[in-house]
Curated annotation (Swiss-Prot):
Function recorded in the entry: Cell division inhibitor that blocks the formation of polar Z ring septums. Rapidly oscillates between the poles of the cell to destabilize FtsZ filaments that have formed before they mature into polar Z rings. Prevents FtsZ polymerization.
Organism in which the protein naturally occurs: Stutzerimonas stutzeri (strain A1501)
Region Disordered: start-end pairs: 109-135
Domain of life where this protein originates: Bacteria
Protein name: Probable septum site-determining protein MinC
Keyword list, A-Z: Cell cycle, Cell division, Septation
Length: 241
């Protein structure tokens, strides 16, 4: 048998595109001691959220005078609070050098991927037609550690959502039972998305990146009630169903 007659081996891997919800820790000040204290407080509020959570460290918003920061100590501090640093978001040369030394990937600064539009263009590009996907319906309980994502549409869960579970949707999220895990609606920036549930007992709710954690939610008079969550500006509103 010649080499050409040999069957091709089955592929050992596939490269697939994926949209993952990654937490971004955006530093506003170069104060590791204060960061340690405030992260500890956040962990106490939502311990299940800080459980080997993947993280992007964003250093691009630091003031110019505060950019000399010990990145190795910063990554160690995040690990101490069970946050796993996947990458840095930075442009400062010293930050890029430190990232290379730690073998951390670097993402471009916020807004760096935006393209300038030439106003003199005579023929504007035709916008892409939106892709509509059917609502994703889940009828079984969502256990702790599970993640369910409805890409391009709404997510409907007809069963309880346990602590440690995570619901993600580009559109709305409906839970016809107790919501005890995390629910993130409008994760691609849809500010009109909403979250509906029969019983609000969530670790976190988020719409288009604006969120409230369990400690904030427990202080709401509608805690443990049937509610809807909507976004007005940068404020999450919780109202009775």
């Amino acid at each position: 048998m010649s080499q050409a007659d040999l069957p091709e081996p089955a592929p050992a891997f596939q490269l697939k595109g994926s949209m993952l919800a990654i937490t971004v820790l955006e530093l506003a000040h170069n104060d590791i001691e204060r960061l340690d204290e405030q992260l500890a407080a956040k962990v106490e509020q939502a311990p299940d959220f800080f459980n080997n959570t993947p993280l992007v460290l964003a250093l691009d918003k630091l003031p110019e005078a505060s950019r000399e920061i010990d990145i190795q100590a910063l990554v160690a501090l995040c690990r101490k609070h069970r946050l796993r640093t996947l990458a840095l978001r930075a442009s400062d040369a010293a930050h890029l050098e430190a990232a290379a030394a730690l073998d951390l990937p670097v993402l471009p600064p916020s807004g760096a991927r935006e393209r300038k539009v030439d106003p003199s263009s005579k023929t504007p590009a035709k916008p892409a037609e939106p892709t509509y996907r059917p609502t994703r319906v889940v009828s079984t309980p969502i256990r702790g550690g599970q993640q369910v994502y409805a890409q391009g549409g709404d997510l409907v869960v007809l069963a309880p959502v346990s602590p440690g579970a995570e619901l993600l949707a580009d559109g709305n999220i409906h839970v016809y039972g107790p919501l005890r895990g995390r629910a993130l609606a409008g994760i691609k920036g849809d500010t009109t998305a909403r979250i509906f549930c029969r019983q609000l007992a969530a670790e976190m709710v988020s719409i288009a990146g604006q969120y409230k954690v369990a400690e904030d939610l427990r202080r709401d008079p509608l805690w443990a009630e049937a509610v809807q969550v909507s976004l007005s500006g940068d404020v999450l509103n919780i109202t009775r169903l």
